[in-house]
């Protein structure tokens, strides 16, 4: 899983919604992390084992879109229908064969869009930390003001206080909203955008975030990413999503009403905002191309930016952001930024202001009045086919755990991961690295010079297991006000966002901290960071069924071994392979070997293009290429460790299929096919097994005509 560093997503508020919607990057989308990538799904080459898929948000709502109905009855009927069918032969559907019982008996929780072992582990981590949270709240009278425990307890208490949220209205967000609405000129509008980014880290039209420089990973650089496209380019341009976009327009209208607009004006604004996002989407790169550093790494000096953004006073804007004076900046999507510039004219000012008001309130609605929060959560539930609203205390708990992720992560690591576990997993990583090195040296399509460089990259790889050695308090400057002193949820959220953004701005002036983690210890995922040439395995994923110190080698190889090898493979996928052993985007291939690699990658993309993901909708082979290369490479590597032990191979394949057992609502599946860089779980099992030679050794009964059989000359793979 590459944990694609979601700098391409908006920070803070939207990031929390992403986290609660899924903490399992390993499974569906994140395998690489921390390389400059564009927001909202733009990838830099970082890879994660899975896509986000843990906690989901729900809440009360006013006039929400209809959610899925009668989940228990529908799922019960589905379960009975499944049981009435026969378990498929392993020769025809290995994923269903192994997971038949669990998939027949397990129901998607009513307040979630999915169930999986990743989801279950995420819920287990939440429960562990929720107990600590409740104990902290009980101790509140004795806690010292300004301590981490006080901040956590009082944040949670304000998150639960509906009356205070209702009374606060927009709270401290109101001045930012007024700054946007009162802008009488484009320069004044841009000044309001700069204030939102500088103070809170929020962006709408011009999205600037810092991350490592691709060509010098020891330094930070500021990247101009794509603008806020709501549900994203892929959905905005999907001709089958008409009814979905109708609901999205209704959601925009409700947000604009909550901003103070009359219903008729809000409806008109909603129509214009959606049309505007579609116009912007037409100018932006598709997800499949946002993973190519050659495409998204475009350095511009401030003077060159001025030519690109002719309707912006670039020096003044950079100064207002606090990032003036850099040698260069990086534009990830030149045509998208050109399109933004074209819209920055006085005749579009009202549209631009409405667009930013919507973007701001959509980001922040979770922390505002019960009605606004309910509207946001109801829209989220509609998008993902979630039938039930989440209990208020669980919602507040998830919000608190997410906002204080590393603070809770330190406590989780202390309780749930031992030094012995860390040593065991580290030893397994080294064993897999050795096997990977052996496989690279045996490749017949790669020359000696490139092999030597690949081995150097493996030997230089940094291993991070369980939890960071040091925890940095990025919220040290934040004052969390207790309810008794008039503290409100929105006020405390803004305090945290200001502290994080100020910390981020100061961090950008220093060399990159190579000890920093992009995931909290409790996250149920893993990632490869190409800019650090590092593989990272949080304690949250180092639990059963992925890892057990009591399991035999083959079984653990099929679980955590597959995760480890997957992340290592990201160092050599279609994007990660372009980074050297120091994490710099630098060519270390011979021309001939690179041509061979790209030819093999093309075959992988073509193969996955033919894989059905869900009811006539197919996997996008280019969009998922990096993750598919990592899946194929990981299984080839770990099976080489088990060798020709057929019993061991069967145990490995069984555990491999087991860890991917999952169920999704129809809506969630469709969205994932559009917006995820990972293939669906069933494809990740069956398609990979069909292309793995050891699978045929373990199950010699496989024959031509079986659905799990693929002739040797048709099998694809690289590593």
Label every model-predicted segment:
Residues 89-93, 97-160:
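Active-site-surrounding "flap" and adjacent substrate/cofactor-binding loops of secreted or lumenal enzymes
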Residues 134-427, 431:
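Noncatalytic, helix-rich "gating/capping" subdomain that lines the substrate-entry/channel surface
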Residues 80-84, 115-116, 179-180, 232-241, ...:
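Second-shell loop/turn segments in exported
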Residues 7-17:
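Bacterial N-terminal signal peptides that target proteins for export
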Residues 150, 188, 194-198, 426-561, ...:
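Zinc-dependent metallohydrolase catalytic domains
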Residues 95-103, 130, 134-138, 161, ...:
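Sec-exported extracytoplasmic/periplasmic mature domains
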Residues 27-30:
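C-terminal motif of bacterial Sec signal peptides marking the signal peptidase cleavage site
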Residues 32-64:
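Short, low-complexity, disordered segments immediately C-terminal to signal peptides
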């Amino acid at each position: 899983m590459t944990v694609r560093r979601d700098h391409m997503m908006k920070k803070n508020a939207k990031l929390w919604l992403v986290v609660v919607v899924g903490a399992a990057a390993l499974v569906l989308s994140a395998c690489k992390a921390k390389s400059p990538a564009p927001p909202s799904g733009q990838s830099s080459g970082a890879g994660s084992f899975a896509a986000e898929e843990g906690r989901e948000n729900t809440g009360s709502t006013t006039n929400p879109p209809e959610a899925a109905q009668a989940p228990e009855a529908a799922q019960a009927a589905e379960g009975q229908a499944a049981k009435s069918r026969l378990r498929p032969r392993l020769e025809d559907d290995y994923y269903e064969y192994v997971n038949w019982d669990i998939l027949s008996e397990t129901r998607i929780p009513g307040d979630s869009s999915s169930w999986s072992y990743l989801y279950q582990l995420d819920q287990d981590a939440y429960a562990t930390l929720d107990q600590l949270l409740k104990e902290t709240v009980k101790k509140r009278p004795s806690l010292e003001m300004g301590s981490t425990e006080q901040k956590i307890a009082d944040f949670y208490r304000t998150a639960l206080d509906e009356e205070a949220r209702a009374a606060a209205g927009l709270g401290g967000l109101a001045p930012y909203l007024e700054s946007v609405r009162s802008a009488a000129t484009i320069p004044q509008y841009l000044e309001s955008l700069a204030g939102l980014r500088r103070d809170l880290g929020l962006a709408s039209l011009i999205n600037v975030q810092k991350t490592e420089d691709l060509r010098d990973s020891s330094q930070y650089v500021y990247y101009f990413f794509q603008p806020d496209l709501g549900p994203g380019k892929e959905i905005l341009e999907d001709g089958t999503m008409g009814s979905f976009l109708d609901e999205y327009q209704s959601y925009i209208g409700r947000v604009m009403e909550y901003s103070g607009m009359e219903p008729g004006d809000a409806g008109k604004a909603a129509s214009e905002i959606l049309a505007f996002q579609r116009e912007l989407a037409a100018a932006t790169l598709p997800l499949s191309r946002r993973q190519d550093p050659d495409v998204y790494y475009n350095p511009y000096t401030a003077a060159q930016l001025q030519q690109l953004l002719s309707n912006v006073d670039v020096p003044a804007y950079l100064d207002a952001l606090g990032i003036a004076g850099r040698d260069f900046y990086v534009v990830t999507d030149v045509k998208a930024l050109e399109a933004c510039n074209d819209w920055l004219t006085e005749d579009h000012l009202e549209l631009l202001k409405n667009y930013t008001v919507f973007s701001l309130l959509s980001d922040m609605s979770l922390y505002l009045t019960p009605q606004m929060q309910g509207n946001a959560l109801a829209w989220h539930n509609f998008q993902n086919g979630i039938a039930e609203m989440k209990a208020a205390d669980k919602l507040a708990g998830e919000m608190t755990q997410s906002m204080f992720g590393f603070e809770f992560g330190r406590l989780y690591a202390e309780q749930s991961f031992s030094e012995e576990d860390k040593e065991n997993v580290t030893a397994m990583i080294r064993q897999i690295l050795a096997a990977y090195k052996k496989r690279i040296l045996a490749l017949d399509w790669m020359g000696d010079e490139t092999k030597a460089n690949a081995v150097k990259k493996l030997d230089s790889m940094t291993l991070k297991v369980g939890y960071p050695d040091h925890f940095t308090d990025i919220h040290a400057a934040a004052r969390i006000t207790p309810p008794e002193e008039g503290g409100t949820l929105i006020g405390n959220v803004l305090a945290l966002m200001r502290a994080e953004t100020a910390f981020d701005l100061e961090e950008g002036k220093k060399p990159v901290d190579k000890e920093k983690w992009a995931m909290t210890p409790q996250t149920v995922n893993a990632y490869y960071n190409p800019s650090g040439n590092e593989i990272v395995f949080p304690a949250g994923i180092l639990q059963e069924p992925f890892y057990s110190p009591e399991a035999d080698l083959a079984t653990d190889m099929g679980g955590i071994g597959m995760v480890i090898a997957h992340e290592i493979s990201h160092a050599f996928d279609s994007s990660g392979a372009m980074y050297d052993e120091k994490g710099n985007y630098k060519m270390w291939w011979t021309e001939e070997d690179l041509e061979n690699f790209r030819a093999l990658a093309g075959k992988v993309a073509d193969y996955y293009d033919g894989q059905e993901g869900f009811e006539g909708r197919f996997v996008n082979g280019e969009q998922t290429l990096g993750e598919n290369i990592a899946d194929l490479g990981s299984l080839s590597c770990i099976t080489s460790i088990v060798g020709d032990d057929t019993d061991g191979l069967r145990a490995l394949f069984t555990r491999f299929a087991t860890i991917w057992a999952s169920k999704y609502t129809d809506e969630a599946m469709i969205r994932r096919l559009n917006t995820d860089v990972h293939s669906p779980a069933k494809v990740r099992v069956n398609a990979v097994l069909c292309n793995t030679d050891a699978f045929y050794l373990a199950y010699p009964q496989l024959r031509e005509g079986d659905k799990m059989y693929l002739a040797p000359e048709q099998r694809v793979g690289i590593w």
